[in-house]
Design a protein with these regions (language model features):
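Bacterial N-terminal signal peptides that target proteins for export
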Residues: 1-8
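Bacterial N-terminal signal peptides
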Residues: 9-16
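Small-residue-enriched, tightly packed secondary-structure blocks
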Residues: 21-236
Length: 236
């Protein structure tokens, strides 16, 4: 009887550790799913010639992809969605695309009544200041960094004052309809917990994006490869 009681007590002591490990595994699975979904979104968008202008892709320092943001989040506020940011490596963000860092889009109501069950967002970061502002802290779009609804069409002109001044250009896709959309009033920040789960406890968004020792997990390679194929080097 004492032996049975000891086994039972031991099981009770180990249960919290087993639960914590199970929760951590599940969270890591969620992060990998986010990366895979982001790769799928980018693949589908770049396969359609009339979506993002090629010259904008060629000039972008970073690309933020937020797959399947639920409409309900816009009604109740709080967390809009979670995704990833991929940046070009090297000095002045001119090298090949690097490892993806995890990011979250948050904020109160910003008038985004998209009218769909889920919406994908893509944000192009167009200059060094915009990219560097996102590496370390939360950024309010339209406040800390200028943002504009991006133009559509591979041959669309991106040289107007509005697009040239904007640090970020934002797009949405709902029910297959792709369009520029303003995200002013929301915030974009590094998802530190997710980055730790994917890359280790010392990993930060800034280190993942700027240090060559960080390599993309397998789940993020399709996203990085698709961007590299579409725009292998940044143009001035």
């Amino acid at each position: 009887m004492n032996r049975i009681a000891a086994i039972f007590a031991g099981a009770l002591m180990l249960a919290p550790f087993s639960f914590a490990r199970s929760a951590a595994d599940e969270n890591a699975k969620d992060e990998n799913n986010r990366l895979q979904n982001a790769g799928t979104v980018m693949q589908e968008i770049l396969d359609i010639p009339d979506d993002i202008p090629q010259d904008l892709l060629d000039k972008a320092r970073c690309v933020v992809v937020l797959p399947s943001v639920l409409k309900a989040a816009f009604v109740v506020g709080g967390s809009y969605g979670r995704g990833t940011m991929v940046c070009r490596t090297g000095k002045d963000f001119r090298g090949p695309w690097g490892a993806p860092a995890m990011y979250a889009l948050e904020g109160g109501s910003v008038g985004l009544q998209i009218g769909a069950e889920a919406t994908d967002f893509v944000i192009l970061v167009m200059n060094n200041r915009g990219a560097e502002s996102l590496l370390h802290s939360k950024v309010k779009l339209g406040g800390d960094a200028s943002v504009a609804a991006g133009p559509k069409g591979r041959t669309a002109s991106a040289d107007t004052d509005a697009y040239m001044r904007a640090e970020m250009l934002s797009y949405s896709r709902a029910r297959g309809v792709f369009a520029g959309v303003s995200l002013e009033g929301s915030t974009l920040r590094p998802d530190n917990d997710a980055n730790h789960r994917l890359y280790g406890p010392d990993a930060t968004a800034a280190l993942i994006i700027t240090e060559p020792k960080y390599e993309s997990p397998e789940s993020g390679r399709a996203l990085v490869h698709r961007l590299q194929k579409a725009t292998p080097e940044r143009k001035m």
